[in-house]
């Protein structure tokens, strides 16, 4: 019997793997697991832990003893969000999960929104990527200042301007992937970023490779416990990556124009 045959199907008919990177998330993770399974009881969860000093990884190990839906990858040191997702999603593809969902461990993503992404993935257009978006009609953010909202909107506008993507929330962290598309195009092997720029890079990689991308509205909550992993280097990484992409796009357009 294969791994896929042993999996319990989700309400949408196929097993889904939820990948959650962690680093010192003991304050939030236990509650998140409970809430996730309350809304998507048939989903499997993979924790990718970077040797959290607060014992997050050890807690997951103990929880796994009586929970077959829970899995863990232990990494030797803090190595960045992008590599955590690449490792976790790669594991999911190898294990035969047809759908892989990215989710934060800090409580920012509401488990109640997960069925919406799963239902949209089952739509007749068979999307390859479903993004939980703050910036489409019906999307919302709780706990952010007006300045932070404006910066996020401006950042996403800059991404759309530079990269020519129609996606309204390219920096969103809650997203559902079709594994077959990732595997067919070897998307994970093309990732160059190490941090939070991963979200923008994955959006552009999948779009440029012909993915069918759609967005569904979600409510994003500001972290209420633990420490934020965001710092200025993350924004610099995203800015440099997007600007390079925009310049490359303009260069290609100019070459096409002059070659006519």
Task: Annotate each predicted stretch with a short phrase.
Residues 1-13, 188-260:
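Hydrophobic helical membrane-anchoring modules
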Residues 1-35:
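N-proximal low-complexity "stem/linker" segments adjacent to membrane-targeting elements
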Residues 15-17, 44, 201:
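Cell-envelope/extracellular polymer assembly enzymes that use nucleotide-activated donors
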Residues 27-31, 54-63:
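Acidic helix N-cap motif at the loop->helix transition within catalytic regions
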Residues 33, 42-52, 73-74:
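Short beta-strand/loop segment that forms part of the nucleotide-sugar
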Residues 49-58, 77, 107:
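A conserved acidic beta->alpha catalytic loop
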Residues 73-94, 99, 111-196, 223-233:
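Acceptor/aglycone-binding surface of glycosyltransferases and processive sugar-polymer synthases
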């Amino acid at each position: 019997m294969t791994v896929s045959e042993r999996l319990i199907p989700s309400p949408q008919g196929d097993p889904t793997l939820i990948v959650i990177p962690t680093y010192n998330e003991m304050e939030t993770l236990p509650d998140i697991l409970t809430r996730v399974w309350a809304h998507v009881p048939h989903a499997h969860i993979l924790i990718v832990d970077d040797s959290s000093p607060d014992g997050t990884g050890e807690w997951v190990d103990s929880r796994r003893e009586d929970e077959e839906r829970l899995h863990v990858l232990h990494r030797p040191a803090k190595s960045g969000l992008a590599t955590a997702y690449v490792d976790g999603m790669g594991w999911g593809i190898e294990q035969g999960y047809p759908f892989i969902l990215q989710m934060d461990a800090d409580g920012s993503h509401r488990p109640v929104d997960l069925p919406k992404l799963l239902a949209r993935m089952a739509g007749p257009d068979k999307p390859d990527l479903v993004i939980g978006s703050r910036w489409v009609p019906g999307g919302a953010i709780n706990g952010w200042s007006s300045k932070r909202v404006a910066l996020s909107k401006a950042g996403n506008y800059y991404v759309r301007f530079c990269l020519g993507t129609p996606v309204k929330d390219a920096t969103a962290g809650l997203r559902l992937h079709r594994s077959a598309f990732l595997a067919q195009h070897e998307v994970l092997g093309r990732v160059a970023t190490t941090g939070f720029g991963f979200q923008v890079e994955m959006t552009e990689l999948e779009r440029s490779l012909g993915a069918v991308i759609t967005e569904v509205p979600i409510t994003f909550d500001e972290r209420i416990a633990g420490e934020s992993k965001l710092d200025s280097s993350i924004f610099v990484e995203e800015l440099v990556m997007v600007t390079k992409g925009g310049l490359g796009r303009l260069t290609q357009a100019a070459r096409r124009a002059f070659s006519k």
